[in-house]
Design a protein with these regions (language model features):
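Activity-critical C-terminal alpha-helical subdomain
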Residues: 261-279
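C-terminal substrate-recognition/cap domain of FAD-linked oxidoreductases
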Residues: 25-28, 35, 39-43, 48-51, ...
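FAD-binding core of FAD-dependent oxidoreductases
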Residues: 1-32
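Alpha-helix capping and helix-loop boundary segments enriched in small/acidic/polar residues
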Residues: 1, 8-11, 41-45, 236-239, ...
Length: 279
């Protein structure tokens, strides 16, 4: 949490410009009841109603936070690219469809938690089920826990238990690494689908699969992670990844979108996109 009054804390959050010597973390009391809601959508275009329904639930306070992952973000933590395709370039659509079918996942996965007294959570869950029932073809699963229950690893982060799982970086094998190009994007379904398809084109043109996630930090915007996963011991992949990162930043600027963080090698490029005080 920030200190009271004027503060410089924000200059050093998620940056390499400061060394943290003292930090305080506000802990939340364990709720009486906790439900994990997971929603799977099969088609790329399902992201439009998925986002629009979620936005309404965020605005009225039913859902406090949420994450959405595309097929690659879901799969990369449990498999590697070579298990599905050994050719060059991104996975062809036929391989993506086979991966989703055999792994039992959708094109999109939405996850969030509902917290509070058991009766309150039950009312929230009823509202969630009614709202998402309007989307054809989705599958919803719910897991619930009472205070003191043991939380399985797959639900631990939604229970406030940190995770340092780096498995997704193994997608291409070798020494897994990634460059992030995350944008702050409006929580509007049609607008995001257009952006997603454009960024997929850019990822694929550079020879990479599009690892995409959305984190609902406020009821009106997402943080859209765009992770370029590569083998840092492969010089050719490193060069392509760096070039793609620059391209993603420049393309986002044309859409009047900006990131909330960037690799230090791109900080001047990012800063040049803002015109306050003559850059």
């Amino acid at each position: 949490k920030y200190a009271y009054g004027p503060t410089l804390d924000g200059l050093f959050m998620q940056s390499n410009f400061g060394v943290v010597t003292k930090i305080g973390v506000w802990l939340m009391p364990e709720p009486e009841f906790f439900s994990v809601v997971e929603i799977m959508a099969r088609r790329e275009e399902d992201i439009v109603p998925l986002i629009d329904v979620l936005r309404a639930l965020r605005l009225d306070g039913t859902v406090s936070t949420a994450t959405i992952a595309n097929w690659m973000r879901i799969a990369a933590g449990n498999t590697t690219r070579s298990e599905w395709y050994d050719g060059k370039g991104p996975l062809p659509q036929s391989a993506v469809e086979r991966l989703m079918q055999e792994m039992g996942i959708g094109y999109w996965g939405l996850r969030f938690g509902l917290y509070g007294r058991e009766r309150v959570v039950a009312q929230k869950l009823a509202a969630v089920e009614e709202a998402f029932s309007r989307i054809d073809g989705i599958e919803m699963t719910v897991a619930s826990y009472k205070r003191g229950d043991k939380i399985p690893p797959e639900h631990s982060t939604l229970a406030g238990i940190p995770s340092v799982d780096l498995m997704p970086l193994n997608w291409l094998g070798g020494a897994g690494a990634h460059i992030e190009c995350p944008l702050v994007v409006p929580m509007q379904g049609a607008q995001f689908l257009d952006l997603y398809r454009r960024r997929t084109e850019l990822f694929n043109a550079a020879g990479f699969d599009h690892y995409c996630g959305l984190t609902s930090t406020t009821p009106r915007v997402f943080i859209n992670t765009g992770s370029i996963i590569f083998d840092r011991n492969d010089a050719e992949q490193c060069a392509r990844a760096r070039a793609l990162g620059k391209t993603l930043i420049e393309d986002a600027h044309k859409r009047r979108l900006a990131g909330y963080r960037a690799h230090i090698s791109e900080m001047d490029l990012v800063a040049s996109q803002f015109d306050f005080n003559d850059h």
